[in-house]
């Protein structure tokens, strides 16, 4: 078998070699890498924000030129970590990262419909005993707000470096937001508010990269 792996544009050669060896150790005969920019880039001018679990990438391309290509290791994982802290401060119970991610998804769904829903999960006390937890979705909003606002500030900074003609183009045609954070209420709203432009969100979250890769042929 062979694999084609989409990676952050700034992934070092050493990191690629480590990943390649890991795949080879699993029996994969051929490993190729392609950057997220290469997968998602379009012929027309494009402003891409790809924010998943581990990192956020910002790419701005036009006229066969890359104006911005930035990778920041700050994304959904930081939301989950903040939710863990918030829940512990409110209840005294520790929840797993999986449960934190679930709360993020459920809270985000509630925010989209302007609701303050009651969320449920389980947490561990200091003796590792499991307890049911009920919290309102508004309790986890500060975690989503913190990360979303920071991502939007980076996007705004990149936007401000562009020539006026490109700024006008993206104000009209919008910014594309993909990755798992595109499913989350917050990033698109903050970006749209800061730049006053449309934000075109993927409808399938983390699966959009997989779909894009299906059309890529290996060398």
Q: PLM features: residue spans?
A:
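Nucleotide/phosphate-binding catalytic cleft detector across ATP-hydrolyzing
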Residues: 1-51, 61-175, 182-208, 214-219
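Short beta-strand motif preference
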Residues: 56-58
């Amino acid at each position: 078998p062979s694999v084609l792996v989409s990676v952050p544009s700034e992934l070092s050669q050493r990191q690629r070699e480590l990943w390649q060896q890991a795949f080879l150790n699993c029996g994969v005969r051929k490993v190729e890498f392609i950057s997220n920019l290469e997968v998602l880039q379009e012929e027309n001018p494009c402003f891409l924000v790809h924010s998943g679990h581990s990192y956020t990438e910002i790419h701005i391309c036009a006229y066969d030129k890359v104006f911005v290509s930035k990778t920041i290791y700050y994304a959904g994982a930081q939301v989950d970590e903040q939710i863990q802290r918030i829940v512990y401060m409110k209840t005294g119970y520790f929840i797993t990262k999986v449960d934190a991610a679930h709360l993020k998804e459920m809270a985000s769904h509630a925010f989209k419909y302007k609701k303050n829903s009651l969320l449920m999960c389980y947490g561990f006390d200091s003796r590792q005993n499991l307890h049911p937890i009920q919290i309102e979705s508004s309790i986890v909003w500060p975690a989503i707000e913190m990360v979303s606002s920071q991502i939007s500030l980076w996007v705004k900074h990149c936007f401000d470096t562009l020539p006026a003609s490109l700024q006008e183009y993206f104000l009209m045609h919008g910014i594309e937001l993909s990755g798992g954070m595109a499913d989350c209420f917050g990033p698109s709203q903050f970006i749209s508010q800061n730049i006053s432009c449309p934000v075109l969100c993927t409808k399938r979250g983390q699966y959009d990269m997989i779909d894009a890769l299906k059309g890529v042929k290996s060398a």
